[in-house]
């Protein structure tokens, strides 16, 4: 019966996804171990995470990225609910993880760590386009993992760096960001799992609120509430002052190089407020996003603002990087202000590019939210060449 309901919910929007879902359902029925894994996930969630989440707005719609770019490429609100609220989402994530490991045995991109005074930021390419991160206090030999979706890849980096994992920072609940919490927290018994209690993050042990600070050695990491992509989405700001270097923003699915995440669980006004939280940070802040979407996003930005020279220069650099499969992160927030359309809703040039409408400086912010909503609609329709 469940297979019929799932297939019906997806009818007309992705027959192939329905077949995948039926396969997962039938496989899970025959596989008792999968059910045990599900019960284990539920039993280890924090008390806060056991509460029933608020219902999603009926206006929400999930539109897929181009094929192969998104672990949640099945479409529809029904699928989103299954993905985030049931064990089917975990099984789907495991399937995507196996495929990515086979396709990219050394990761989807070549990354380079950034070294500061006793602090190292190490990007780890996982799945088909995700990034996890290790933030390391090199003097103390302590590490913090951000969004460790592939525990095998993250553990390999931990062993290579010869550090002790003491904390996991989860930006949000989606499996492509939280899927490694179980294995890593079991392997590293003293490891704490941080995140928002509103998001149902698996294996959460230490709930965080807006402006809470996580301290690990010399690392001072502040949580900033940025709802919109999910209700409890957080970004993490590593303070650069203790090591006399630039601050680092680990943005999850809020902000990408020249892009932003979809508003799955909120409104345009909510997402605008979250993006404004980032805009308040300094220009030299390094942006470490959750996905490698740079080339696609800059292509869309060129459609919106074709005469933006900052975007053109960045696109040329990104294309050279991607020809060699090199990572494009980090960028800086100063750069993003110059070419990221989702951070430029206050700019008259962008409003004029999208046509007439209310002024971008209205006191209630309504017109900026409308512009953001229109940008999101156009981005979802955009296809990269």
From Swiss-Prot:
Undergoes cleavage at the N-terminus. InterPro entries: Clx_II_MBL (IPR035680), HAGH_C (IPR032282), Hydroxyacylglutathione_Hdrlase (IPR017782), Metallo-B-lactamas (IPR001279), RibonucZ/Hydroxyglut_hydro (IPR036866). SMART domains: Lactamase_B (SM00849). Binds 2 Zn(2+) ions per subunit. Keywords: Cell membrane, Cytoplasm, Hydrolase, Membrane, Metal-binding, Mitochondrion, Phosphoprotein, Zinc. Its cofactor is Zn(2+). The keyword Hydrolase applies. Induction: By Hepatitis C virus core protein. It is an enzyme of class 3 (hydrolase). It catalyses: a thioester + H2O = a thiol + a carboxylate + H(+). Residues 32-42 have a biased composition (Polar residues). Expressed in many discrete areas of the brain. Zn(2+) 1 binds at residues 172, 174, 229, 253. It comes from the Eukaryota. Zn(2+) 2 binds at residues 176-177, 253, 291. Its EC number is 3.1.2.-. Residues 32-56 are annotated as: Disordered. The keyword Metal-binding applies. GO terms for cellular component: membrane; mitochondrion; nucleus; plasma membrane; presynaptic cytosol. Pfam families: HAGH_C, Lactamase_B. HAMAP family: Glyoxalase_2 (MF_01374). Probable thioesterase that may play a role in cellular detoxification processes; it likely acts on a yet-unknown alpha-hydroxythioester substrate. In vitro, it is able to catalyze the hydrolysis of S-D-lactoyl-glutathione to form glutathione and D-lactic acid at very low rate, though this reaction is not physiologically relevant in vivo. NCBIfam families: GSH_gloB. Belongs to the metallo-beta-lactamase superfamily. Glyoxalase II family. This is Probable thioesterase PNKD. It comes from Mus musculus. The gene is Pnkd.
